[in-house]
């Protein structure tokens, strides 16, 4: 395996900027996943962190003129990606004893470090006839500011699931890929995932995980399997946003973003499907499905 590229450029959170040290557990998370970090422009079969400027989000004056502007820095730092395969759907991956990101954080905390760290994970669950896949994207912070009391991200993390479903937005773009994939994905470049798909939220004391069931929408499932059919030729940027719906919430900010670079299906790590025990609401984590049968993606601007 080739060595990891140098630390990302300063378009992301400052802890990933040259000259700044990345916390050890985040560095471990970045470099130990089933998909390695690769060069932003030439890398294949891995992930990278695209500059926020490739995404257009609601600007400070959006509700006056509907103008968007290039996104700035991420609120949270990239902490790696997992590409997983299992005999059944993988739920609540951060609760697993073998989750490498939480293992790294726990090791750091046993040394008295990273005690205020917070992890945000998005688990895209991809159904299959015999095998299920999960693409899990991790973001993290050691600073309280991104999730400070009163911030939109704080309201999202600590809010109820009705609020989350109305606000959780994916913005995406095809960086490289066949015309048919560009056409299909381009028609759904911004989507309120909580309204279009079944989303399950798991909140722990120091994390929030969002499991997105791609199979709950026929259109989303068809688009994804179209892309997977030529996945080694596709590079896609995905950004995650809490949608601003009031002037005081503008401008919109990226929670985090990832570029998946010409991934190979065979790169998936095989993991055992575990039964997730039921925990009453308010004890440890919360789980709510946004039940909705739909063949239409909820598009957004």
Where are these regions (language model features)?
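Extended, low-complexity intrinsically disordered regions enriched in serine/proline/glycine/threonine
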Residues: 2-142
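Extended amphipathic alpha-helical regions
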Residues: 104-117, 123-301
